[in-house]
Structures are given as C-alpha cells and as structure tokens.
C-alpha cells in the first residue's frame, strides 16, 4: 500500500526513540508531532512499547487515512484527531484486558483489534466484520505490518462458531445487544469487554445482572475529553 515515490519526510525523534519516516504517505510533515503525542499518551497510560511498535501504530494510522476513501473506514480525516480518537482511545484499554485469545466483533477498520495485536504480539487476535471491503483492508495492513497474530475474517457473528477467552467491541450502541450476539462465542471462563462512552445504565444492569458480573473501568484517554469506559462482563455461575 505504501508509495515509495513520495518526497522524503522529516524524521521523528522521541527522546532516544527515532521514528523512520520511510513508508509514510499521509502523515507527512505532521509525523514528528504525531509521534510525540503518541509517545506521551503511551507514557500516561503506563504501557511499555518498543520504538518499532510505536512506528507500527503510526504506520497503521497512515494507511487508515490513505485508504479511507476507498474502503470507507472512518469519518475522521484529520491525522491528530484520528490518532487521539482511534489509536489512543484503543490504547487506553490495553492494560485492562484479560489474557487469552481475543475476538473483536464489528471491528470496522480493525479497532481495537489491530491496536491490540500490535501492542500484544503474544495474543491471538481475530477481527470479525461482515463488511468485505474493511476486512480486505485489515488483511492487507496486517500483512504489511507483519501482524502474524492477526486473523481478519469477513463473516457475520452468527456464522462464526469459534469460542474465545475475550470478546471485544467498540461498535455496539447497546450493551444488551452486544452481550446477546457475543455470548455464544465466549469460552466458559471468558470475558466480554465493551468500549463505551457511558457506564452501564440501570436498565442494562437490571436486564443483565442475573447472569453477568459487571466490572466498570473508567478510562482516562489522553487528550480526549469525552467520557470513556470499558465494561467487563463475566458469567456469574461458572
């Protein structure tokens, strides 16, 4: 996907970390600024990532914006805004995720699946979406970024019959709907993890409370002023 004919770009240095500008197309002269915003966010979130992992996150952002029109990946086109609202927003859940194999349903452009796969190369990640074009993008970017732990699948959740230790989603407006479609894909001792703006409502707790144990984690996403929560649900009677 990269365009090697583009003019040379300014390199980005973060302390003793150097981000090689080779291969970047859309980020251009903003690369140093974006690299520093990312590094500061990683530090604030308490995540340990190598220089290569940080570069890979920025390459993903670059390709997301480059191929956005062709694949209809995101409504956000400004690189700084996309970095904060997509990449850093997903980074905020990394330290809170239970261990084990992971399925991300309704993954869209691969959020949070690709971000998790970059940060946790030891974890097996499956990105599931019924949109063929978006899965083609994830397949291509996973190959280019060397994400051997990523498996993109174009399918509806109802037709996917594998069980996972962790099932995530960033796409569902309703927590109840997410639980309904995700539960059949969850291993017995597994966890459902929903990225949400607000904490669970009283109605959601009432409907789900008999069968599910709730853990609500308030997320502090660097540079994002919107309310963000990770809702973790596990079976009460296992």
From Swiss-Prot:
| Any GO molecular function | rRNA (guanine-N7-)-methyltransferase activity
Statement: the UniProt record of this protein carries the keyword Methyltransferase: yes
For this UniProt entry, what's an example GO CC term? Answer: cytosol
Main location group: cytoplasm
For this UniProt record, the keywords arranged alphabetically read as follows: Cytoplasm, Methyltransferase, rRNA processing, S-adenosyl-L-methionine, Transferase
Q: Which reaction(s) does the protein catalyse, per the Swiss-Prot or TrEMBL entry?
A: guanosine(527) in 16S rRNA + S-adenosyl-L-methionine = N(7)-methylguanosine(527) in 16S rRNA + S-adenosyl-L-homocysteine
In terms of superkingdom, the source organism counts as Bacteria
InterPro entries (UniProt xref)? rRNA_ssu_MeTfrase_G, SAM-dependent_MTases_sf
Matching entries from CDD domains are given as: AdoMet_MTases
Positions that bind S-adenosyl-L-methionine: 106, 111, 157-158, 170
Q: What class of enzyme is it?
A: transferase
Q: What is its EC number?
A: 2.1.1.170
Name where it's found. Answer: Cytoplasm
Q: Does the keyword Cytoplasm apply?
A: yes
Role noted for this protein:
Specifically methylates the N7 position of guanine in position 527 of 16S rRNA.
Family recorded in the similarity comment:
Belongs to the methyltransferase superfamily. RNA methyltransferase RsmG family.
Q: HAMAP family of this UniProt entry?
A: 16SrRNA_methyltr_G (MF_00074)
**What is the name listed in the Swiss-Prot or TrEMBL entry for this protein?**
Ribosomal RNA small subunit methyltransferase G
